[in-house]
Curated annotation (Swiss-Prot):
UniProt PTM: Predicted to be exported by the Tat system. The position of the signal peptide cleavage has not been experimentally proven.
Residues annotated as signal peptide: 1-31
Cofactor(s) named in the record: Mo-bis(molybdopterin guanine dinucleotide)
One Pfam family per UniProt: Molybdopterin_N
Note: Expression of torYZ allows E.coli to grow anaerobically on a wider range of substrates than does expression of torCAD.
Species per Swiss-Prot/TrEMBL record: Escherichia coli O6:H1 (strain CFT073 / ATCC 700928 / UPEC)
Protein name: Trimethylamine-N-oxide reductase 2
Amino acid sequence: MTLTRREFIKHSGIAAGTLVVTSAAPLPAWAEEKGGKILTAGRWGAMNVEVKDGKIVSSTGALAKTIPNSLQSTAADQVHTTARIQHPMVRKSYLDNPLQPVKGRGEDTYVQVSWEQALKLIHEQHDRIRKANGPSAIFAGSYGWRSSGVLHKAQTLLQRYMNLAGGYSGHSGDYSTGAAQVIMPHVVGSVEVYEQQTSWPLILENSQVVVLWGMNPLNTLKIAWSSTDEQGLEYFHQLKKSGKPVIAIDPIRSETIEFFGDNATWIAPNMGTDVALMLGIAHTLMTQGKHDKVFLEKYTTGYPQFEEYLTGKSDNTPKSAAWAAEITGVPEAQIVKLAELMAANRTMLMAGWGIQRQQYGEQKHWMLVTLAAMLGQIGTPGGGFGFSYHYSNGGNPTRVGGVLPEMSAAIAGQASEAADDGGMTAIPVARIVDALENPGGKYQHNGKEQTYPNIKMIWWAGGGNFTHHQDTNRLIKAWQKPEMIVVSECYWTAAAKHADIVLPITTSFERNDLTMTGDYSNQHIVLMKQAVAPQFEARNDFDVFADLAELLKPGGKEIYTEGKDEMAWLKFFYDAAQKGARAQRVTMPMFNAFWQQNKLIEMRRSEKNEQYIRYGDFRADPVKNALGTPSGKIEIYSRTLEKFGYKDCPAHPTWLAPDEWKGTADEKQLQLLTAHPAHRLHSQLNYAELRKKYAVADREPITIHTEDAARFGIANGDLVRVWNKRGQILTGAVVTDGIKKGVVCVHEGAWPDLENGLCKNGSANVLTADIPSSQLANACAGNSALVYIEKYTGNALKLTAFDQPAVQA
C-alpha cells in the first residue's frame, strides 16, 4: 500500500524474500588482514569503516570529494551510542494486562523480556485484533528512516509480513513532498519531484542564471534515498567556480548562500509568500510583453484563464510587483529586476521542497512551473525548472550498467485476500493523527471521498514519527488510542518510549547488504559488509518477521524467506544487476569475487545521458511526446481540479494566505522556519558527537535576527523559550543578520524530550500545526506556524532525550 521514493525513481521492484538467521554471521577474516578497514555505505555515501577489538573506531568517506560530509564520521556513534535499545522490552502495564493497561504510553516503566516472550505476545495480540477488526485495523505504514540496502529495509519487511498475515492499512505520499507529488501529475503528468533533471553538464554549459528557490543543497545533498554518489555537491562547486550569477530566494541565509558568497544575490521574502512573489514576477513579464506567447500557446493549456487572475480581471486585484512587494517584503524594484533578469537570460529555476511543506503548499510548485512556462525555456539546455537538484544528486547523468533490484513487500506466489476483498487501505501519511482521532471519518483526497480506518494496532519499524509529525502534544494524545503499539528500532527514540513492545534491531553495520549510489545516476554498486557483531540482543528485521511468519502458520518462515538466506538474496540481487549490465555490454565480476574484493563498482558514463534535457522530447514534438495530463500539455488551468471544487486548491495557481503568517501575526509573534539540519538526516544522528558542532547551551539552536533578539532582550548563547498554543520548547540563541526579520529558525529533527510540558531538547514539531496542505494532497504544513520567544530564566533542565527509559528490575 506504500509507493516509495525508490519506486518513483527506479520504477523497478522484485518479489523477493529475506534473510532468516538465528545467529550473527562471522566477521570476514579479510577485515583483520587488511587492517580492519571495511567498505560499506549509508545514506550519506560509501564509507570505509575501521574496526578494532570488535568495535568501530572511525569512519570516512570512500569517494573523492571537494566538500566534506560530516555525516560520514558517525558510524561509531550509530553502533555504540548509549541510546541503543539493548533488549526486548514491554511496557509494565501492558505486560500485566494487554487488554487494559493501567498507565498510559509514555508514563510507564519497561520490563525486559526474552525474544520468545516478546514475539509470542505480539503474535497473540496481533491475531486477536486482526480477527476482531479485520486487516484495516492494523496500521503498518511505518513511515520513516531506512537502511540504504536493497535487502534490509525495515518498512518493506514489516509490510511483507503483514501481507502474509492478511493485509494492513498503509500510507500514501511522504512528508518531504506530500503536496507537490499530488499536484504535479495534474500539471505536468508526473510526480516530478523524483524525476531525473536536465544534466549538470548542460547547466554548466548553457545556464546563464541559476535561481535557488527555497533550497539548501549544501545540507540536503549530504544524503540520498539510497546512498549519495556525492556528485551534486561537486557540480555546485563547479557552478560556483564558473562565476555564473546565482539568485537565492530563502528567508534564511543558508550554508549554500554563504558558500556562493559574492556570486549569490540573497532575496529573503516573508515566509509562505513565494506564490505572491512568483505572481509579481509573472505580472511584470506579462505587462512588459516578455512572456513567451508562442510557448504558452503550443505547450500549455489554460493560460488565458490564469492571465485573467494575474491581471485582476477575475478578482479586481492585479498581481503586480507592487502588490507582491506588500505581501512578500521584497521591494517592488527588486521584483521587477528579477523578472527582467530571468527573461533576458537562459534561466534555470531550481526549487526545493520546504516551500510546499506549508498550508496551500500545492500552489508553490504549480506556480513555479507556470512561471517557467511564461519564460518559455522549458525543454531547452540549461533552462526551465527542476525540483530535485537538491536531492539525491539529481542532474548527475544516469550511468549505463547494472541496477540492483530491491526487496518487495509482495511474496512470490502469495496474494493477500484482504487486497482482493478491499480490506486494505492507505491514508495520506501526514494524516495519521486525524485517522486515530476520527475512526470511520470521511475526508476528501485528490478528488475522492475516503474513509479513515479504525486503527487498533500500530507497528512502526525503524521510523521517528514523533520527530517528523507535526504538533507533538496532539500526537501523544492520539497515540493512546490503539490497543497495541509495537516499535522495532535501533534507538530509544520518543516513539519507542511511547510503545507497548519495543524490539532491538541491528544497524546496517551489523549485517550484510548491497546498495547503489545515486538514485538518478546509478553510478556505483557498493557492498555493505557487516563490520561488527550485533550489539546486545539486537536482531535483523528479517529474523524477527520470519519468526513471526512461522507463528502465523506452519511453514510461514519458508514462505516469507522463499528459502533464501542473507547471502543467497544478495547474490540474487547482484546477479540480476549483472544480467542487466551484460545486456548493455558492461562487465561486472562474479558475485563471490566482487564480495571478496572490498571495492565498489562504477558504471559506465553515457554521452547520451550527459545531454539529457528534462522535457526536451516534449518540446521537440509535443504531440508524439505528450505529457500524462488530460490535455497532454502543461496545465496552467486544470479542468480536473475545477471539477473537484476545492476552495483550498483552485483550478489555477493562486495566492492563498495561510492561517499563520506575518499577515495574521500580532506584534510579538514571529514566523517559524523548520529547515533541514546541517549535521543530521532529520532526526537521525541527533544523539551523535556531531551534536557538539551545533548545540547551543546543550539545546537545539534557534536562529534569531539581531533586531528581534534585541527587542526581546536575547543575547547570543542565551536559553530561549519558544511557545505557542500547541506547546513550548527550550532552545539556544544564535543571533545574526542572516535571517529575515520576523522569522526564527529551529531546524527540524531534534528528539522530543518533554518535562512538565516543556521540550528540553528543542523539537520544532512541538510548535508546528498538524493541518493538511489542502483537501487535494492532505500533506504536512510544518512551515506555517507563528511563535513567541523570550529569554528563559527558569531552572536549567537536564536533557534526557537520549537516555534509556526507566526499567523495572
